[in-house]
From Swiss-Prot:
GO terms for molecular function: translation elongation factor activity. Belongs to the elongation factor P family. Signal peptide: none annotated. Pathway: Protein biosynthesis; polypeptide chain elongation. Keywords: Cytoplasm, Elongation factor, Protein biosynthesis. It holds the Pfam family EFP_N. Involved in peptide bond synthesis. Stimulates efficient translation and peptide-bond synthesis on native or reconstituted 70S ribosomes in vitro. Probably functions indirectly by altering the affinity of the ribosome for aminoacyl-tRNA, thus increasing their reactivity as acceptors for peptidyl transferase. It comes from Listeria welshimeri serovar 6b (strain ATCC 35897 / DSM 20650 / CCUG 15529 / CIP 8149 / NCTC 11857 / SLCC 5334 / V8). This is Elongation factor P.
């Protein structure tokens, strides 16, 4: 059991018969009344996001999850195949279970598979990934002084806002939690 006062981003807990990852939390101490913790949680089985409020000091069960390092191999219809590089064991995950993460996956990319009681429930991406720009408008001289941005389509189909100096074929570092441009690679 863990106190809600000890919440950290990325912590995995068991609440309401589900396995949830803490995405965000805020300790609130109102002038009147008891303190509470407002949290934003993602269900690791369904991908649903829920906001939940806990009373200060309330205890919740910490989920015992295992992470296995695997490589993304390929898409097979609506399933995606991953392989353990040590045992060469392959597993398939349905597209709807990892829909958010698919925007960042490239073939042969190393990721962590999240396991709970022997069941595969999702994947953990690195904080940043390197992706190549496949389509964007050309930058026009003088545009950089305004500090604006333009949309760019990346090799996985993800569209992000990038600075005007980015061109097709550039390799970019992308933040996976915010789906945002970080820098050139």
């Amino acid at each position: 059991m863990i106190s809600v006062n000890d919440f950290k981003t990325g912590l995995t807990i068991e609440v309401d018969n589900g396995i949830w990852r803490v995405l965000d939390f805020q300790h609130v101490k109102p002038g009147k009344g008891a303190a509470f913790v407002r949290s934003k949680l993602r269900n690791l089985r369904t991908g649903a996001i829920q906001e939940k409020t806990f009373r200060g000091g309330e205890k919740v069960a910490k989920a015992q999850i295992d992470n296995r390092k695997m490589a993304y191999l390929y898409a097979d219809g609506s399933n995606h195949v991953f392989m353990d590089n040590e045992s060469y064991e392959q597993i398939e995950l349905p597209e709807d279970q990892i829909a958010h993460e698919l925007k960042f996956l490239k073939e042969n990319m190393e990721i962590n598979i999240i396991m709970y009681q022997g069941e595969t429930i999702g994947i953990d991406l690195p904080n940043t990934v390197e992706l190549v720009v496949t389509a964007t408008d050309p930058g026009i001289k003088g545009d950089t002084s305004s500090g604006g941005s333009k949309p760019a389509t990346l090799e996985t189909g993800l569209v992000v806002q990038v600075p005007f100096f980015v061109n097709e074929g550039d390799k970019l570092v992308i933040n996976t939690t915010e789906a945002a441009y970080v820098s050139r690679a």
